[in-house]
């Protein structure tokens, strides 16, 4: 570890923190329907969209109506994307003549992008046409991200409102998120990335002659526009198979920094939106502080592990750090920081191969996802996931003192706690249950390229990433099989919607309650004590669930490496 490395980490954190208040203030005005700097340009478009769709912007929905609208919308998105992938060989904008995507891979890909996971069992430049990338994947990148923001706002309204039957309009929230937040920022980011050297073209791949005289095909395409939303919307699906390790997808150190910042920007700002909407910004800062504690701890462990290098090689006298699977132009610190950022948010983009990290260096990205993607998390999804843990933390505190817990003047009762636990428990059920299934079936055991604990880690990481809607992977797993395409699709769908629906039920229940004044026995939820309680509950309730599985994978791999033991390749 070096001073320059820690300076890079500090610079990243400073830039993200500087964006929290201005972005939070702007998005609060957007969600409240107030006038913004873009209203003269976008308000007529917004009204036109409502008229075309027959939507009354003043009509709000109950939590059930909001949820049903969301589910129907996503079902239609899945069908349309699946159809594009299956028919791409007969559709235009296919200069490289890509064949139709196989049914099981199309299923996996459609579920992946609709759920904001962007797990990719294919290489983008060798499998998909430009039309599939632009008309199929990119709209889902926008809409799945906007859905996460909309749902976070709906849950926030549950805390902010009193004696209300409604939590907002899904159609209005979705439109405003896309039109006023995602689209303008992505246009600016696309221009920036083109300036940095990313391709943005509809032309076919370029044939070039190398210095050795060999012919090489260089894939290009509408890269910059897809990278803009894949990072801002915490989607993570790469245009190229190498994702952000590809020089056309991450050409410079400045582009690398901006991509990391945009992964966190909206998720961090949503904590400020929450504070503003409930009338106490300190509540948002407390939630962000809890996220920050977990994030910085993860960065420190990952950076230290990668800088220390492999225990096996260290025992042989080599101590240059672990550069396997990393771009030399980024180095250890930028690779480690990117890995923690992309898994703390539900992004999944990578600028290094996580499968090549040390055992402890790979454990932290996996643990980030297993906690439920609540360390900033996906746009919107991180906030509503963290608020679920807030309710559980207050319930635990209430048990310790023998009184009904309260949060922002709302009593937290049995219904809210049951819904919160349902949202929390569905993730380990999918992550551990499907991983266990894969370890006992021949089709599952055929996937990992490594034997021993690292092979198990590859399986566990895959289902963890799918259920957490992250999309990153340990690349040693062969995932493009019928077994993995279908089971991963199941994990992605359950991990997305079985968290969303309970969160909306909580929103509806809280919105209907009256707001009570704080009393002498009310636990302050804006100070260090509450931040510590929240972090502790997250680690105990969320983290300990996975300790036995982690002990069989990265933990035993690290201990074996420290003892000089290695495992042969092959499943």
UniProtKB/Swiss-Prot annotation:
The chain crosses the membrane at residues 3-23, 64-84, 135-155, 179-199, 254-274, 284-304, 330-350, 357-376, 421-441, 488-508, 527-547. InterPro entries: KdpA. It comes from the Bacteria. The keyword Lipoprotein does not apply. Keywords: Cell inner membrane, Cell membrane, Ion transport, Membrane, Potassium, Potassium transport, Transmembrane, Transmembrane helix, Transport. Disulfide bonds: none annotated. It is a multi-pass membrane protein. One of its GO terms (molecular function) is P-type potassium transmembrane transporter activity. It is found in: Cell inner membrane. GO terms for cellular component: plasma membrane. It holds the Pfam family KdpA. The system is composed of three essential subunits: KdpA, KdpB and KdpC. Part of the high-affinity ATP-driven potassium transport (or Kdp) system, which catalyzes the hydrolysis of ATP coupled with the electrogenic transport of potassium into the cytoplasm. This subunit binds the periplasmic potassium ions and delivers the ions to the membrane domain of KdpB through an intramembrane tunnel. Belongs to the KdpA family. PANTHER family: POTASSIUM-TRANSPORTING ATPASE A CHAIN, POTASSIUM-TRANSPORTING ATPASE POTASSIUM-BINDING SUBUNIT. This is Potassium-transporting ATPase potassium-binding subunit. It comes from Methylorubrum populi (strain ATCC BAA-705 / NCIMB 13946 / BJ001) (Methylobacterium populi).
